[in-house]
Amino acid sequence: MEMTLMVSLCLTTLLTLLLLKKFLKRTAKKVNLPPSPWRIPVIGNLHQLSLHPHRSLHSLSLRYGPLMLLHFGRVPILVVSSSEAAHEILKTHDLKFANRPKSKAVHGLMNGGRDVVFGPYGEYWRQMKSVCILNLLTNKMVASFEKVREEEVNAMMEKLEKASCSSSAENLSELFVTLTSDVTSRVSLGKKYWEDETAGGLKKRVRQIMELLREFPIGDYVPALAWIDRINGFNSKIVEVSRAYSDLMEKVVQEHLEAGEHKADFVNILLSIEKEKNNGFKVQRNDIKFMILDMFIGGISTSSTLLEWIMTELIRNPECMKKLQNEIRSTIRPHGSYIKEKEVENMRYLKAVIKEVFRVHPPLPLILPRLLTEDVKVKGYDIAAGTEVLINAWSIHRDPAIWGPDAEEFKPERHLDSTLDYHGQDLKYIPFGSGRRICPGINLAMGLVEVTLANLVGRFDWSVDPGPNGDQPDLAEDFGLDVCRKNPLIAFPSSVA
C-alpha cells in the first residue's frame, strides 16, 4: 500500500513538472537569436576553429551571415563580420559592450585584470585610462620622445649599412621587435632594459607573458575540463611568470626612486602621480608595473608586426616599392641622411601604404573580446547579457561590398583620396578598434612606424633569396596575441647612399 502510494506521488509529481515545463515554454517570450551552426555537446563550436580563427570565422560568416552566434564550450560568442553590425556594437550600444570577459590568463598575468588593455570596464578602469592618456600618450608627450625614436632608428640603420657593405641578409622581423622594444623601454623605463640580462631578463619575461596570453585555457570555456590547465602546467606557469615580471619591475621602480631623477619617462611620471590623490583615486605600485607591461605588449604586437607586414608587401609588390621610394627620395637630400619625422608629414603615398597594410594585415584581426553586460537587440536579434563578442576586423577589411572586387589585393592607391583614419569613426576600417575600448596608443605607434618606414625604404633597396614563391616572401601567418609572420622576414638591404 505504501509502495503504491509512493509510486503514485512520484508519477503525479513528474507529470506536474512536465506540464509546467510545457506551459512555461508556450508562454515564454519568443527569443530571436542570430543564425548558429550546429554545435557539439560540451565543446560547442570549438571544433570549427582552425589555427587561424579569423579565417575560419570568416568562412562561417559567409554561410551563416555577418552576425552569428557560436558557443565556445558553454560560453555564447557573438561573431560580428560586417561594418553595419560593428556600428551597433561599437557605437550604438558601446557602453553595454564595453566590458571584458574574465580570463584565467589575464587575471593571473595582468595584475588581476587591473590594467588598461584587459581590465573590466568601470570607474577604476576609466580613471586608469585617463591617467594613461592625459599623462603618457598626449601628442605633446609623444612628440617629446622624437629624439629617442631618431636614435633607435639610426642604430638600426647602422646595422643595415653594415649588412649592405657585406652583402649580408638581415632578419627584419627580429630587428623590428628590438627596435620597438628599445624605444618602448627608453620611453617607459628611461633606458634600454630589453636586452639587459643583468636587469633580470625583461625580454624573456615579456615574451613569456605574450606567449601565455595567446594560449587557450580550456577551463575558461569548459569548466569540467579545467583540470587540463592544471596538469599541463598552465596554471603554475602563470603564477611563476607573473611573479618574475613583478619582481623585475619592482627593481626598476626602486632604481628610479633611488636615483631621484626627474627624467620624463613613464615610470617617473607614474611615480609622481602615485604620490597624489586625484578625486580619491590613487595609483598603486602594481598599477605602475602593469601599465608599463601594457606599453610593451602594445608596442610589440602593433608596431613591429605592422612593420614586417609592410616590408613583406612592398617586396612582393615592386611597383608599390618604387612609387614609395620615388616619393621619399625626391624630397630628401642628400641621399643616405636620416629622414626626420617632420619630413614624413607630407608623404601621402607612405601613409597610404601603411593604411593599406593595416587593412589587409590588421595586427589584431579579431579585436580583443568584449562582454555584454545587459540584454540588447542587435540588427533585430536578441543578445543576452553575458555573451562575449568577437569583431572580425579582418573580415570587415576584406568585404567586397565596401572595398570593391579587388578587396583581396594590396592596393595603397585606394587610400590616396580617402578620409579614413585610425580612430574608428568609420566602422569599415578599425585597425585599432573603436569606441571606449579603442587602443589609446595610436599616436605613439604611428610616430615610430612612419619614420622607420621612410628610412628603411628611402635609404635602401631590398631583395630576398629566391624560394618557393620566387623572389617574393611568403604570406604565412602565425596567430597569437597578434597575427605576425609565421616565418621571419629575411631580406638583403642595398644602400643607395
Swiss-Prot record:
It is an enzyme of class 1 (oxidoreductase). The chain crosses the membrane at residues 4-24. Its main location: membrane. Pfam families: p450. Heme binds at C439. It is a single-pass membrane protein. It is found in: Membrane. One of its GO terms (cellular component) is membrane. Its cofactor is heme. Its EC number is 1.14.-.-. The keyword Heme applies. SUPFAM superfamilies: Cytochrome P450. Belongs to the cytochrome P450 family. This is Cytochrome P450 71A18. The gene is CYP71A18.
